[in-house]
Amino acid sequence: MSGALTRSPEPEANLGYLFRLAHQRFRAALDDGLQDLGLSAQEYVILSVFETRPELSSSELARITQVTRQTMHTAVLGLETAGLLERRPRNQRVVLVRPTRRGRKTLAAATERVRAIERTALAGLSRNDERAVRTWLANLAAMTTSTRQTNVE
């Protein structure tokens, strides 16, 4: 039975199934690799947004990471409690979030681990193949949800 759980799926399998399985396995590898830093894959994604932006509101973070505001609020509170994020009011209605010094150090350490996991996932691919995979995934991520084939026969 355990052999069936670890067997690779057929490349001809349903694309949605392959995406889901790949995502689950990759996320599990991230969670495992980040665990001793006190981060989950989701928390790493949140912190990584700050690599290119100094501070954001929770609503902006939620939009960027495609989660609900409520989910982001809970995540930000957890990261704040862990000493990785801090909040400061912009005005009476908006509170900005930014990484603490500890948060930036944790992000740097986590990013090294994530890159190692990525290298493992991409092992065996040529540079051209890796670039093709990354380009394809980026294009797929940008695909609108309204894209449908209307001439199905």
Where would I find each of the regions flagged by the language model?
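N-terminal leader segment of winged-helix/HTH proteins
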Residues: 1-37, 128, 151-153
